[in-house]
From Swiss-Prot:
It catalyses: RNA(n) + a ribonucleoside 5'-triphosphate = RNA(n+1) + diphosphate. Its EC number is 2.7.7.6. Gene3D superfamilies: 1.10.132.30, 1.10.150.390, 1.10.1790.20, 1.10.40.90, 2.40.40.20, 2.40.50.100, RNA polymerase II, clamp domain, RNA polymerase Rpb1, domain 3. This is DNA-directed RNA polymerase subunit beta'. Belongs to the RNA polymerase beta' chain family. It is an enzyme of class 2 (transferase).
């Protein structure tokens, strides 16, 4: 076997007959599998030990040679080599076919590769191959055309006409093989290139397609006649096993049935040929052989599939590769692993951020080898076998050893579905009793876990390196920030929020108000002994608190509450004292009004101060973000644990309860509803009198009921008691929102009908009063729709993530700086008046391209190629700068990835991104993970002016990334200039928009009902939308440059996500969009050897042009192509990645003809072949480090190394019938 971590590339080609023979260890001549009595493989059968190797390790079939000492000996009695059984997984056999057979992939695929090579229609090919017609192979002197088709009857007539032997015509795959042998690739290619110079329309398209296939054969060195099989490989028997079930029956792989049919028909054909049977019988047998081979390679591709018992189609070789259950996705891209377990999760409130609780019985099983090694090392027993027995008996001594073994040995916890990289994190195990895994409450948000029965899987990293990586890179305490937006993902929730909210409340007139304490301990003691209430405002000597005070503040008394003193106790020392829940206090310190000079009147000072609101969930989030910014991970995770403990403690002390009496009653609800009823009557009257249309009536009625609900909501908010438990839960952000509250106490309002239209009858009751039967019935529609939507959305969003990951999986940070000379000019994204993403948000964490100067003073704010920090971004925006040129992924020149400067900071860490970071996968997860939060709806723009539906939510995101024609497409102008007129044409129900510019005039026809975006006299740019709606990006690409299209797509994706309140960093969308515009279509090859009309990577295109320009030739011209993510994934340079994504057979067929080489640059390819992935610590620059003793002389003057001298082997993979097998050449 090849050492998998050593080879550089993998090639797939067509297998020549000699190649198949070289793989084979013998011919399979009989259809038998195993003997029903002895259960031993039959001689020359499908499981023959002579061909495929012994069924028992180091033992021949007859038992003459047993034991390892005879390895490599071939038994003289039974002819079986003495070796490992494992060879039965890798040794192949073959079947010598008595008649050539066509390979269905190359004949049936779309486009038919055989058809293009021979310039024959697939229909004609089918007739010839399946013995329905003759094809002329050599017309000799007759007027017949070469490759023309004739029926049996015509053939006989021609023979009579021209005489026997006057021309050659054949049928079957043999005929096609002869024709393929006649193809002169060089000559045909030259002719096609000539033809392309003049051809147009369909002819041109066909010529380009033929040229593509012929050129592929020519360049790869594959012979076209290899598409016809004379010899069929038989895959190793352990890949198509027969298993004995209890009850003496056998379960066998379908492939054995399919091979058996081929062998039976082949043997029968051999016999008929020996007997010189009549031609028609031989023909029929050859046709049946052809069908048997078709079924073996791809059952069901042509005609009805061959079925097994219960009319179930048999699984052929192609099916073994295809789909979710196929070889690629089931066994290569992800496998089941040992040293893993799963269990229900329970909450572990006492754990530290980096810990998880693992049940004892689970841990002993998972860490068994480590425990056994330690038992032997301590001389408790002498060997591993005895140690194993000790562990399995559950000896008392093993538990102490287990405790020691798991110290410092992190484990990974994973919750399905793993939507982003925070779905797998590392923890230090803590042994617990019980059978449930214990999870820290703060990491629940990252996992999206709750404790209503969720299960989680646990994995043990085994090697030292794996443990080190888990500890350094994956420890839960390190994952404070969310990679999608750089905001903290671990914010306290529920009880923790409630406790801190209650703790920091302020109340007037509670016991102990106005007392003054000398230090924290005195204040807390007074509180513990009941002299002062947690919420009372008191004074404390400022200098007793260890905080960054000014000299003046130090000698005063601080007015605060005991609760806030306790709250500030848990904060790091460098942070200001937190008195008000706002950002000013957090960054600049306590406002002056809270300081009282020594000897001042404290009662009066307190009465002059307003009560502060308590700290809510949002404020806690801001505090965490600020602490992370200042102190980084270690301090932040320690603070989070302290905040968690404080929150749980005080929510327990607060003792919040909820009863029916806590739901307030709105006194004037009846009047508000009565008023609305009257208004609705007036609206209906207007409609009856014909003053308004039905649409207007409907809109007015629904608007009226919405207003009524809002009025009730406002009353509720105005009259609420801040100490009401429900209000406290809602206000603190612990649970529930104003909408839930108003359904409990106000009214439920309007409901949606099953068709998505809002019903005019509102639900007037709230949950406290209870609903009537009719109201209850109405509200069930919405509930059901919600459940269905969620289920559908999850599947859709998961599939979107899969496509995104696939298209960007090879985008890795490859170098420090690509040295590009281009940048991206950015400004804030806005839709009309509404701000979608501010300039400050877009600048944070990016590198500048040009110097940014103050627009008024001209002072330099930041130089070129510098990192824009949060503070710098704020400074730029405050200076009034509206647009900045930054380094962007769009303009990065790095091949197969991005450079550090164009990417900016890694949002998950807040530092500059490291070389080796798999930013493509992170981008895909960041866009896909919130997909489930987006809606599934297509909104109807209510009422009058809508003939277009605006797609939003998940369908819109898919529409953008798949580059589809949008629903409700906007009309765009190709001319830059002024709108001169808009004319309405009532007869055709359209409008015409006229645009006049310097380069020419444009006239655009717009639907009558479309809403216009422009007015007469307005200026429009090229590619600007004239009507409301989404622009079709492919049209935009035709009139504008690539960067404009990329910028447009970026803005569109942001609009969808931001409108749903989901924040995603621009750079993630940039990575995805860049992958959609990586290809160029060659329009004119110039002097290069590129083919016209082919799609190729931008980098390869520029390389080809570079060579020609250096030689002084004419470069090729190309046009950038925008592809949807699915198409882009299939067009990737890696055939392994594409084949494992979708359309496996088509990808492999194409790759084999081209003799494609996979250079293993992406992640998937390497996972498939079992090589360490080239990202993170798997990158060559980190892997090829040799530890050596430092020689000072060398250290100061390092020797220059030559490049490209690492030892590698090339691996060539051939596809024959379908087997992908590795051979080293």
């Amino acid at each position: 076997m090849v050492d998998v971590n050593r080879f550089k590339s993998m090639q797939i080609t067509l297998a020549s007959p000699s190649k198949v023979r070289s793989w084979s260890y013998g011919e399979v001549k009989k259809p038998e599998t195993i003997n029903y009595r002895t259960l031993k493989p039959e001689r020359e059968g499908l499981f023959d030990e002579v061909i495929f190797g012994p069924t028992k390790d180091w033992e021949c079939a007859c038992g003459k040679y047993k034991r390892i000492r005879y390895r490599g000996i071939v038994c003289d009695r039974c002819g079986v080599e003495v070796t490992r059984t494992k060879v039965r997984r890798e040794r192949m056999g073959h079947i010598e076919l008595k008649a050539p057979v066509s390979h269905i992939w190359y004949f049936k695929g779309i486009p038919s590769r055989m058809g293009l090579t021979l310039d024959m229609s697939p229909r004609a090919l089918e007739e010839v191959i399946y013995f329905a017609a003759y094809v002329v192979i050599d017309p000799k002197d007759t007027p017949l055309e070469h490759k023309s088709i004739m029926t049996e009857r015509e053939y006989r007539e021609r023979l009579r006409e021209y005489g026997y032997g006057s021309f050659v015509a054949k049928m079957g795959a043999e005929a096609i093989q002869d024709l393929l042998k006649q193809v002169d690739l060089e000559k045909e290619i030259a002719e096609l290139k000539e033809e392309l110079k003049t051809a147009t329309g369909q002819k041109r398209v066909k010529a380009i397609r033929r040229l593509d296939v012929l050129d592929a054969f020519y360049k790869s060195g594959n012979k076209p006649e290899w598409m016809i099989l004379n010899i069929l490989p038989v895959i190793p028997p352990d890949l198509r096993p027969m298993l004995q079930l209890d009850g003496g029956r056998f379960a066998s792989s379908d492939l054995n049935d399919l091979y058996r049919r081929v062998i039976n028909r082949n043997n029968r054909l051999a016999r008929l040929l020996e007997l010189n049977a009549p031609g028609i019988i031989v023909q029929n047998e050859k046709r049946m052989l052809q069908e048997a081979v078709d079924a073996l390679i791809d059952n069901g591709r042509r005609g009805r599939p061959i079925t097994g018992p219960g009319s179930r189609p048999l699984k052929s070789l192609s099916h073994m590769l295809k789909g979710k259950q196929g070889r690629f996705r089931q066994n290569l891209l992800g496998k089941r692993v040992d040293f893993s377990g799963r269990s229900v999760i329970a909450v572990g409130p006492t754990l530290k951020m980096y810990q998880c609780g693992v049940p004892r019985e689970m841990a002993i099983e998972l860490f068994k080898p480590f425990v056994m090694r330690e038992i032997v090392a301590r001389d408790i027993v002498q060997n591993v076998k005895a140690a194993k027995r000790l562990v399995e008996r559950g000896d008392e001594r093993i538990w102490d050893i287990l405790e020691e073994v798991i110290k410092e040995h992190p484990v990974l916890l994973n919750r399905a579905p793993t939507l982003h990289r925070l779905g797998i994190q590392a923890f230090e195990p803590v042994l617990i009793d019980g059978k449930a895994l214990r999870l820290h409450p703060l990491v629940c948000e990252a996992y999206n876990a709750d404790f209503d029965g969720d299960q989680m899987a646990i994995h043990v990293p085994l090697s030292e390196e794996a443990q080190a990586e888990a500890r350094i890179l994956m420890l839960a305490a390190e994952h404070i920030l969310n990679p999608k937006d750089g905001k903290p993902v671990v914010t306290p929730s529920q009880d923790m929020v409630l406790g801190n909210y209650y703790l920091t409340m302020e109340e007037a007139g509670r016991e102990g108000e106005g007392m003054v304490f000398k230090d924290r301990d005195e204040a807390v003691m007074a509180y513990r002994n009941g002299y002062v209430h947690l919420h009372s405002r008191v004074g404390i000597a400022t200098d007793s608190l260890n905080k960054p005070w000014t000299e003046e503040q130090r000698h005063k008394v601080l007015l605060t509450t005991v609760g806030k003193i306790l709250f500030n106790d848990i904060m790091p020392e460098g942070l200001p004292y937190l008195q008000e829940p706002n950002n000013a206090n957090l960054t600049e310190g306590v406002p002056a009004k809270y300081f009282l000079p020594l000897g001042g009147d404290i009662k009066e000072a307190i009465s002059n101060l307003e009560l502060n609101p308590p700290f809510k969930k949002k404020n806690l989030g801001n505090i965490i973000a600020e602490i992370f910014k200042r102190f980084r991970t270690t301090e932040t995770s320690a603070l989070l644990d302290r905040m968690k403990n404080l929150g749980y403690h005080h929510s327990t002390l607060a003792g919040l309860t909820v009863g029916i009496a806590d739901i307030p009653v709105v006194d004037d609800k009846a009047e508000i509803i009565e008023e609305s009823h009257k208004r609705v009557e007036q609206i209906t009257k207007q409609f009856r009198r014909g003053m308004i249309t039905d649409d207007e009536r409907y809109n007015a009625v629904t608007a009226e009921w919405r207003a009524a609900r809002e009025k009730l909501e406002k009353r509720l908010i105005a009259n609420q008691d801040p100490k009401n438990p429900i209000v406290m839960m809602m206000d603190s952000g612990a649970r529930g929102n104003i909408s839930n509250f108003s359904q409990l106490a106000g009214m439920r309002g309007l409901m949606a009908a099953p068709n998505g239209r809002i019903m005019e009858l509102p639900i007037l009751s709230n949950f406290r009063e209870g609903l009537s039967v009719l109201e209850m019935f109405f509200s069930t529609h919405g509930a059901r729709k919600g459940m269905t939507d969620t289920a559908l959305k999850t599947a859709d969003s998961g599939y979107l993530t899969r496509r995104l990951v696939d298209v960007a999986q090879d985008v890795i940070i490859r170098e420090d700086d690509c040295g590009t000379d281009r940048g991206l000019l950015i400004r804030s994204i806005a839709e009309g008046k509404e701000m979608i993403e501010s300039l400050e948000e877009r600048l944070n964490g990016r590198y500048t391209k040009k110097t940014v100067k103050h627009p008024e003073t001209g002072a330099v704010i930041i130089g070129p190629n510098e990192l824009i920090t949060e503070d710098k971004a704020r400074e730029i925006v405050n200076a009034g700068v509206e647009e900045v040129t930054i380094r962007s992924v769009f303009t990065c020149n790095t091949r197969h990835g991005v450079c550090r400067h164009c990417y900016g900071i890694n949002l998950a860490t807040g530092d500059a991104v490291e070389v080796g970071e798999a930013v493509g996968t992170i981008a895909a997860q960041s866009i896909g993970e919130p997909g489930t939060q987006l809606t599934m709806r297509t909104f109807h723009t209510g009422g009058v002016a809508s003939n277009t539906d605006i797609t939003q939510g998940l369908p819109r995101v898919q529409e953008i990334f798949e580059a589809r024609n949008p629903k409700g497409e906007a009309v765009i102008t190709e001319v830059k200039g002024q709108v001169t007129a808009i004319e309405e044409d009532a007869s055709t129900r359209t409008k015409k928009v006229f645009v006049k510019g310097e380069t020419g005039e444009g006239e655009y026809v717009v639907p009558f009902t479309a809403r216009m975006r422009v007015e007469v006299g307005g200026q429009v740019a090229r590619g600007a939308a004239l009507t409301e709606g989404s622009i079709q990006p492919k049209r935009l690409l035709a009139v504008r440059d690539v960067l404009s299209v990329e910028t447009y797509l970026l803005g569109e994706v942001q609009k969808v996500y931001r409108s749903q309140g989901v924040e995603i960093g621009d750079k993630h969308i940039e990575v995805m969009v860049r992958q959609m515009i990586r290809k160029v279509r060659v329009m004119d090859p110039g002097d290069t050897d590129l083919l016209m009309g082919t799609l190729m990577d931008i980098n390869d295109f520029t390389d080809a042009n570079k060579d020609v320009l250096i030689a002084g030739g004419v470069p090729a011209t190309g046009r950038p192509v925008l592809m949807g993510i699915t198409k882009a994934s299939l067009e990737t340079n890696s055939f392994l990645s594409a084949a494992s994504f979708q359309e496996t057979t088509r990808v492999l067929t194409d790759a084999a003809i081209r003799g494609k080489k996979d250079h293993l640059l992406g992640l998937k390819e390497n996972v498939i072949i079992g090589k360490i992935i080239p990202a993170g610590t798997g990158m060559a620059r980190y892997r090829n480090l040799e530890p050596h003793a430092v020689n000072e002389e060398e250290y100061l003057n390092p020797p220059v190394e030559e490049e490209g001298n690492e030892e590698t082997t090339e691996v060539v993979v051939d596809t024959a019938v379908e087997t992908v097998e590795e051979t080293v050449e």
